[in-house]
Amino acid sequence: MTAHTNSPRILVIGTGDTKSDELLFMADVIERAGGSPVMIDVSILGNPPYEPAYSKHDVAEAAGTTVQAIIDSGDEHSAMALMAEGATALVRGLSQRGQVDGMIALGGSLGTDLALDIAAILPLGVPKFIVSTIAYSHLLPPERIAPDLMMILWAGGLYGLNPICRSVLSQACGAVVGAAKLVEKPSAEKPLIGMTSLGSSCLKYMRFLKPELEKRGYDVAIFHATGMGGRAYEAVAAQKGFVAVFDFCIQEVTNAESGSVVTSGPDRMENAERAGIPQIIAPGAVDMVDMPAWQNVPEQFRDRPYHAHNRLIASITVSPEQRRAVARVVAAKLERAAAPVAFILPTGGVQERDRNGEPLHEPEALGAFLDEMRGAVSGTITFEEVDAHINAPEFASRALAVFDRWVAEGIVVKGNVA
């Protein structure tokens, strides 16, 4: 794995007509840190007092329109949405040509709105920084935050440079250049397997599966399925970064169906199937919805069993009817897969806290999910039941047996055993 030895190309994105002093300062810091700033101007009304690498006219053209047409669109919201569309298309093209080593954007709410779109289309692993007056605030929908995005509060930054602003901007620019210089590109030495899970207090199969897969010559990346982790998993799947996946914690689908903010977006369980990646699926933690522990419990869940994991996140079981609905959603997603899918159903339970005597034990509700899943899965999907809990060795062994069979049949590429 190698890091950049030359000057990394860093996109510097902002409205040069209103923030020229700050953007020029950022470009200077990037150069002094050993990077090559590539200025992209997303102004609408005015012009920057410098020559950007890509002008607002280039951005508008990438959106299939003109700056004047954008001005005539009627209001600042629609105008910035069009500029976001153009900037995203422009940056996507640069990235596909290998001309982006990192990005940093500067903005208030309008600039942040635009920058979130750009960060979302850059591949996982490309350093992404946004310096924003609303960094990590409640204004940002979780599903719009790229999984490896870094944000820094633009403290005291409106209307020109000052000592606080210089400190913030210099830190951010130094960070993006340093990240671009030192980032290690993922190694292709061994095939990569993706796996989803929660922490070992809830799900434990990875303790058995990871070393067994590594013995077979694979690297294994395990994603913490609490919203952002699922988003990262989906991003790598969309890039065809896995040779196979063990998607054993699909709780984020339950979260999405229940309206929780702990979401990985509407495309959870969809990118591996689109990419033609073989999938082994299990319903880990599908019986509960995660909510912020510091918020009031929504009315619909007030009477449901509740477990606070810590001061940040709490789990609430969903009703039998909701579990049936989730089963139908999961089955519908799997039907669209372009590669083999195996669904393994552990009839003894789907997470550690649903065991007999534990706070989330609801055998009738679990039975509702199992029953609905049996009827919803079609014959195009390999369906296996295991008379065991998902955390039992029997479950992990069955999953590994399916994987080994797929390797023997050539469905999954063989591992690289040293």
UniProtKB/Swiss-Prot annotation:
This is UPF0261 protein BRA1168/BS1330_II1159. InterPro entries: Tobamovirus_resist_UPF0261, UPF0261, UPF0261_C, UPF0261_N. Belongs to the UPF0261 family. CDD domains: Tm-1-like. It holds the Pfam family UPF0261_C.
